[in-house]
Amino acid sequence: MLIGLTGTPGTGKTSVSKFLERKRHWKVIHLNEMIKEEHLYTEVDEVRDAVIADMELVRQRLEEIIGGKENEVIILESHLAHYIADIVIILRVYPPELKMRLKARGYSEEKIRENIEAEALDVILVEAFEWCKKVFEINTTGKSIEETEQHIEKIIDHILSGNEEELPEYKPGSIDWIDLVP
């Protein structure tokens, strides 16, 4: 079962997925790393300091990796995961906290602004609704990696047992920061 762990850069995807990998021994595919390492991109955007993924090549490579493992929990970690996985968990964070996290990473002011706007406008959530069958949201604001991991585990365990309707606290659209948009 492929489960996407997605969200705006800086919401905690990589940190929490590495924790899940160690704790639950679930296979985690760090998609952004794979795209760069295996040259699964069409071009490099120097201005935005990013690569433009070739999604067809990415899908082909994932089929090679995942083929025959449909009964295993496989987590696809990336801000692009919602374009591939049918089930996604979106990590969200309060935009002012996101700004601090991205500054600490050394992001440019332009890239920080772009990501804060994307978070406040629910860009990934809207895209996930277009692409995915099941969508869940977790507010990671002020939460430790361990706390976030517990929320993810709860969601996945409920999905595996077929009880995801018992998860109203992760209902998409319950997190709203639109008032923060200038």
Curated annotation (Swiss-Prot):
It is an enzyme of class 2 (transferase). Signal peptide: none annotated. One of its GO terms (molecular function) is ATP binding. Its EC number is 2.7.4.3. Residues 30-53 are annotated as: NMP. Keywords: ATP-binding, Kinase, Nucleotide-binding, Ribosome biogenesis, rRNA processing, Transferase. InterPro entries: Adenyl_kinase_AK6, P-loop_NTPase. ATP binds at residues 10, 12-15, 105, 143. It catalyses: AMP + ATP = 2 ADP; ATP + H2O = ADP + phosphate + H(+). One of its GO terms (biological process) is ribosomal small subunit biogenesis. Pfam families: AAA_18 (PF13238). Residues 104-114 are annotated as: LID. It comes from the Archaea. PANTHER family: ADENYLATE KINASE ISOENZYME 6, POS9-ACTIVATING FACTOR FAP7-RELATED. HAMAP family: Adenylate_kinase_AK6 (MF_00039). Broad-specificity nucleoside monophosphate (NMP) kinase that catalyzes the reversible transfer of the terminal phosphate group between nucleoside triphosphates and monophosphates. Also has ATPase activity. Involved in the late maturation steps of the 30S ribosomal particles, specifically 16S rRNA maturation. While NMP activity is not required for ribosome maturation, ATPase activity is. Associates transiently with small ribosomal subunit protein uS11. ATP hydrolysis breaks the interaction with uS11. Belongs to the adenylate kinase family. AK6 subfamily. Interacts with uS11. Not a structural component of 40S pre-ribosomes, but transiently interacts with them by binding to uS11. This is Putative adenylate kinase. It comes from Methanosarcina barkeri (strain Fusaro / DSM 804).
